[in-house]
A protein has these predicted regions:
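SDR active-site strand-loop-helix element
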Residues: 6, 30, 69-72, 111-117, ...
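C-terminal substrate-binding subdomain of Rossmann-fold SDR/epimerase-dehydratase oxidoreductases
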Residues: 193, 198-352
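N-terminal Rossmann/SDR dinucleotide-binding element
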Residues: 1-68
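Glycine-rich NAD(P)-binding loop of the Rossmann-fold in SDR/ketoreductase-type enzymes
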Residues: 87-98, 134, 138, 142-143, ...
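Conserved catalytic-core motifs of eukaryotic protein kinase domains, centered on the activation segment
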Residues: 39-41, 79-86, 122-126, 174-175
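Conserved Rossmann-fold NAD(P)-dependent oxidoreductase catalytic core, especially the SDR/UDP-sugar
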Residues: 97-139
Length: 352
């Protein structure tokens, strides 16, 4: 199967590419390069060719001959979305729907979209299934709901959209992110000797390792059409519905000698538990191989190997919002997050 995947140089994309190749697929990546500075370590894996291009600029001609698309490239996570809700809506909702339409027009048969369990919002102890009411609290989560709605409406006998509602990701990637809860707490523990939870640790968060997300993507690509046509799947495992305090305790135990601290109850009311029964029923080859404890151990091993320090841990390329702010503040990106050509930054030099 010829597979195009967007966000190829991102946190998940850097792990997905080798997974697609090892699964026997002819893969090609697309990435505009917003986070290319964030390379933490070399995993030695062979990767598909990655074309440097903004997904918004792709045409139906570019997509001709592609059997399936995996769409990862969006402005990721809630804090980033709230920083500029209008831009988030333009890129994540309008941009993703327009891209899906181009895929359909080009003859792409399967469209796997990376959605999120964050659409469930604040549900407390209720176990959320794919048919539960959604309660998106942020621009990022609202966009996920809207994309699912609008792309599902495109489904027909020739076009099969699939929506993977990923739990909160964790784990090591060459394109590392430190703005995800387990990764962040682990980085703090290793570099500063503290596990700092800004809230009281009571919010509930389902977690899923990026390797397991990539496995779910491959399963969604390879499944019979009738098993996935227009379907949404929560991606994770019910044993990994954690309270944030439980995640913090696991990190504290993994990084011996670290000091665990909690803050007051925060204003963020997002808290949800999720059922993952449906994905096991429809995609029986999928199962999570990682849990939070194994993920913390993996991160510790990586940190020890590369001798992670506070400077690297706190560097902008490993935190989505900080890196985008840097690129905009230095005028490398325009207000619509498109790269500013060097000739526009140095007109006198370009004129020579």
């Amino acid at each position: 199967m010829r597979v195009l995947y967007t966000g190829a140089d991102g946190y998940i994309g850097a792990v997905l590419g080798p997974k697609l190749l090892s699964s026997g697929h002819d893969a090609v990546g697309i990435d505009t390069g917003l986070y290319r500075r964030g390379w933490l370590f070399d995993d030695g894996c062979t990767r598909p060719m990655v074309i440097s291009k903004d997904t918004r600029q792709l045409t139906t001609t570019d997509l001709t001959g592609i059997d399936a698309v995996v769409h990862l490239a969006e402005l990721s996570n809630d804090p980033l979305g709230e920083n500029d809700p209008g831009m988030t809506m333009e890129i994540n909702h309008e941009g993703s729907v327009a891209f899906a339409k181009k895929c359909k027009d080009a003859g792409v048969q399967r469209f796997v979209y990376a959605s999120s369990c964050s659409i469930y919002g604040a549900s407390g102890d209720e176990l959320k299934t794919e048919t539960s009411l959604v309660d998106p609290r942020t621009a990022y989560a609202k966009c996920k709901v809207l994309v699912e709605r609008d792309v599902r409406a495109m489904a027909d006998s020739r076009f099969t959209p699939v929506f993977l509602r990923n739990a909160t990701a964790f784990g090591a990637s060459p394109r590392q992110r430190f703005d995800l809860v387990l990764n962040n707490l682990s980085g703090f523990a290793y570099t500063s000797g503290t596990v700092r939870v800004m809230s009281d640790g009571s919010p509930l968060r389902p977690l899923v390792h990026i390797d397991d997300i990539c496995q779910a993507i491959v399963c969604a690509l390879e499944a019979p059409r009738e098993a996935v046509w227009g379907e949404a799947f929560n991606v994770g495992d019910e044993t990994q519905n954690y309270a944030v305090r439980d995640i913090a305790n696991i990190v504290n135990e993994t990084f011996a000698g670290s000091v665990l601290t909690f803050g007051p109850a925060g204003a963020d009311d997002r808290s949800y538990r999720v059922s993952f029964a449906k994905i096991k029923e429809h995609l029986p080859s999928f199962c999570c191989k990682w849990d939070a404890r194994l993920g913390a151990l993996q991160l510790k091993s990586v940190f020890e190997r590369i001798q992670l320090d506070e400077k690297v841990f706190n560097a902008a390329p490993f935190t989505r919002l900080a890196e985008l702010r840097h690129l905009r503040d230095t005028e490398q990106l325009d207000p619509r997050l498109r790269w500013t050509p060097m000739k526009d930054m140095f007109p006198a030099v370009a004129a020579e």
